[in-house]
Design a protein with these regions (language model features):
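Flexible gly/pro-rich beta->alpha loop and the following alpha-helix that scaffold active-site loops
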Residues: 1-31, 35-36, 40-42, 133-144
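A conserved active-site-flanking secondary-structure segment within enzyme catalytic domains
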Residues: 19-22, 26, 36-77, 82, ...
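Proline-centered loop/turn at the N-terminus of a beta-strand
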Residues: 25-29, 76, 93, 112, ...
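Conserved hydrophobic/aromatic beta-strand scaffold that supports enzyme active sites
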Residues: 56-58, 103-105, 115, 389-391, ...
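Beta-strand-turn-beta hairpins that frame and shape the catalytic cleft
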Residues: 73-74, 91, 108-113, 384-386, ...
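A conserved amphipathic helix/loop scaffold
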Residues: 78-80, 86-97, 328-329
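A glycine-centered loop/beta-turn motif at secondary-structure junctions
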Residues: 88-91, 97-141
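ATP/NTP-dependent adenylation/nucleotidyl-transfer catalytic domains that generate, transfer
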Residues: 139-540
């Protein structure tokens, strides 16, 4: 398989393959950029599309083929591209198209060469797994022998080999990934050789530290402790507004504290290494695979951590797994659902949900709505974008129309990567603007209280059990008396690589908004309508 990626086949230094691959007799599937490369090297033509496709689309299967065997002729798929195949290579035939992409799937069955413009590997291509299965088992002749649950014994052996006679110190967050990695390492080495530390950064949600202490106190049998470091993190983040800079600072501060703990605890005798709950999407989004674009630097993928990896002083037992697979491993380990069903929470915590602004700036009127004077991180064409946010004044009723409209607006406006809708406000949208702001104890507490309201109401209503994650984002947009606003960002996903924005029932939304607007300093409540891609789940 030749994967998608942020490059263009016309860029100098873009990834390529030996053209002899396509006459080797091996079955080849090109996905997105991989399809472009296959077409160009086989004598076709690739052009930059008139408009990109970022989000859901409908594939119309033009010709029956083994790749789409047992599937409907119309398929919901997921697009993230601008370049597209304009002319089929000799020997290829058209398999499918979308409304804006005339060549969305192609094949040369004689040479077993297949190309798809969409992404079958993401869960939002509804039957993408079956397409991949058709390629693997019907075209390539592979056998089914992968089951993450059956890998526990193998993973334990890998941990023992990686660690050797040394011991392991874990930094723990209380999330699913670090909990499963920690528990798995204890099972492989025994509790006396695995210690856990939770760094209280001062950036956590309400009640988070108490929850983590209870969870790991029961798992760790006395080898778990909490390191207070709130003042250090807040000092390091003072005046920092760039989201990538925030992530790097937090990651480096974690490394500094790790070194301090190692020295203080006499862990520097060479017998201790660092353990982490890094999973595969962390590596991809940090540009950690050969040709991946940096979308966001994950806090456990900064330079300091990379140096530890190079020095062979780190073990990451889950680095090849996705979130859904990690949960399956956790169940096999006997961890309770109260831990495994927790929504994902970013390592940098509330720091990347507390957006900052350099200067005062009003909202700007455009044809489709209002441009908010802030920017958010997105992923478009498999690469990172950092662009303004479009706000709509009305909150539509029909969920599907709402999400479809957001996708169309982004595809039509190259300068944005996210669409929000105003739910409730103390002042009209044209009267709000940004204020100079940074991460401060006051703003963090405002966000903490807002997040607690949202989590409580989502749990009481059962809404949190119907979604993957519910970020609550504080943005420095408001008026002089109420300088901040809140963005609600509920999404549904399986592995975090793609996500659908989810609409909640209006009665719950109204109740949530009323409680949020009763908090001091909050001006408005917005609702994020954007899928991933083109937006990332987190705003930073």
């Amino acid at each position: 398989m030749i994967s998608g990626g942020p490059s263009s086949v016309y860029e100098a230094g873009s990834p390529t393959v030996d053209p002899a691959l396509f006459s080797s007799g091996l079955a080849v599937l090109g996905i997105c950029y991989g399809m472009h490369l296959m077409a160009q090297l086989s004598g076709g033509r690739v052009e930059r599309g008139e408009q990109g496709e970022f989000g859901p689309a409908l594939l119309e299967v033009d010709e029956p083929d083994v790749l789409f065997r047992d599937l409907e002729s119309s398929q919901p798929i997921w697009m993230s591209h601008r370049d597209a195949v304009a002319v089929l290579p000799p020997g290829f035939r058209l398999l499918g198209h979308t409304e804006t992409c005339p060549i969305a799937a192609m094949a040369d069955e004689r040479r077993r060469l297949y190309g798809v413009q969409f992404h079958p590997e993401v869960v939002h291509t509804r039957r993408g797994a079956e397409m991949l299965a058709n390629f693997l088992f019907r075209i390539c002749g592979c056998e089914r022998d992968w089951d993450p649950r059956r890998r526990l014994g193998e993973l334990e052996q890998q941990i023992r080999l990686a660690v050797g006679e040394r011991n392991v110190l874990f930094f723990l967050s209380g999330g699913v990934d670090s909990t499963v990695a920690y528990t798995l390492t204890i099972r492989a080495l025994g509790p006396e050789r695995v210690h856990g530390v939770y760094v209280d950064t001062g950036l956590m949600r309400e009640g988070e530290t108490e929850f983590v202490a209870a969870v790991f106190g029961s798992i760790a049998s006395g080898s778990f402790f909490i390191e207070p470091a709130a003042e250090e993190f807040l000092r390091a983040l003072a005046g920092v507004r760039d989201p990538e800079h925030k992530r790097v600072i937090i990651g480096e501060k974690f490394v500094d504290i790790q070194e301090r703990i190692l020295e203080r605890g006499h862990y520097l005798d060479g017998n201790w290494i660092l353990g982490q709950g890094t999973i595969y999407p962390d590596t991809i989004e940090s540009g950690g695979t050969a040709h991946a674009d940096v979308i966001k630097t994950h806090h456990n993928r900064v330079a300091g951590i990379q140096r530890l990896i190079a020095a062979r002083r780190i073990v990451e037992p889950l680095a090849s797994f996705y979130k859904d697979e990690v949960r399956e491993l956790g169940r096999e380990l006997g961890l309770p659902e109260t831990i495994l069903s927790r929504h994902p929470f970013p390592g940098p915590a509330l720091a990347i949900r507390c957006l900052c602004a350099e200067a005062a700036e009003p909202v700007r009127r455009v044809e489709d709505g209002w441009i908010l004077p802030i920017r958010s991180v997105g992923v478009q064409g498999d690469s990172r974008s950092y662009r303004p946010v479009l706000a709509l004044e009305q909150f539509p009723i029909e969920g599907e129309q709402l999400h479809d409209e957001a996708t169309l607006l982004i595809n039509r406006n190259a300068g944005i990567n996210r669409v929000v809708s105003l739910v409730a406000s103390h002042v009209p949208l044209p009267n709000v603007g940004s204020r100079p702001s940074e991460i401060s104890p006051e703003r963090l507490e405002r966000l903490r209280r807002a997040d607690a309201i949202v989590r409580r109401l989502a749990h009481e209503s059962g809404f949190d059990r119907r979604i993957w994650q519910f970020p609550v984002v504080l943005i420095p947009v408001g008026d002089a008396a109420r300088p901040d606003s809140v963005v609600l960002r509920p999404v549904d996903s399986v592995d975090g690589m793609t996500a659908n924005a989810v609409l909640m029932e209006r009665r719950l939304l109204d109740r949530m908004s009323a409680e949020l607007l009763s908090l001091g300093g909050l001006c408005a409540v917005f609702y994020d309508l954007t899928h991933k891609p083109p937006a990332t789940i987190e705003w930073e």
